[in-house]
Amino acid sequence: MINQLIANIKKTGAPIVVGLDPMLKYIPEHIQKKAFAEFGETLEGAAEAIWQFNKEIVDKTYDLIPAVKPQIAMYEQFGIPGLVAFKKTVDYCKAKGLVVIGDIKRGDIGSTSSAYAVGHIGKVQVGSKTYAPFDEDFVTVNPYLGSDGVNPFIDVCKEEKKGLFILVKTSNPSSGEFQDQMIDGRPLYELVGEKVAQWGEDCMGDEYSYIGAVVGATYPEMGKVLRKVMPKSYILVPGYGAQGGKGKDLVHFFNEDGLGAIVNSSRGIIAAYKQEKYANYGEEAFADAS
């Protein structure tokens, strides 16, 4: 799947992933009104609104971008109907030729980790039949539990030709409370980066490993170091825009071939119509603004 992601990036010339992280406050009133008229002010109504919102954005952007990244928490907050909207979004994006990164940040051990992996990027056996429950192309994984937590995901990736982005240095301000702790003179995030590179050695696509890393745009100097630590790992870069990451800092995350990273933008794209410079589009044309 890493080969497909790179092919999509080369085709579009845009190393961008759109974060499909819908909140009701981002969704134009006319979409909410229509959904609530059909389903009431219910979880089902909210889920219908976010599904229709996502669908319109994807329809307007799918030929401009290589990938999308739905954050599952934004769907889980609406319960089972929200998860149905998540699945519909994943399927629709894949049908449009987009690579889907499920931002699930799972982390556990043994059979629990295997179940997470099977549920999101693998297949589950039900009697004589098999099903791919959510069927994303990549997922994000929390490595805090070590190899016991990550290896079950890697095993499924090998079987299904899928991929991972493992949290290494996250974009949030308090990430340093743990990630910057020094161990034998080196920060923990660097040691995690080395482990990601090691995990990726046996998981190569044509040019890059399908075991990637998450490194925040808010820490460009650390990104520069980690780029060297993980030369064959694709880096998913959150934190650009609303979280403070600057465009000039993004160069550190790429290799000299112009590849090696994909930059996430969520509200900057899906809620573009709320920005002053795109306000002329109005709520009705929100997807055109995106």
What are these regions (language model features)?
Residues 64-66, 70-127, 132, 222:
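N-terminal active-site wall of soluble small-molecule enzyme domains
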Residues 260-290:
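C-terminal functional extensions of proteins
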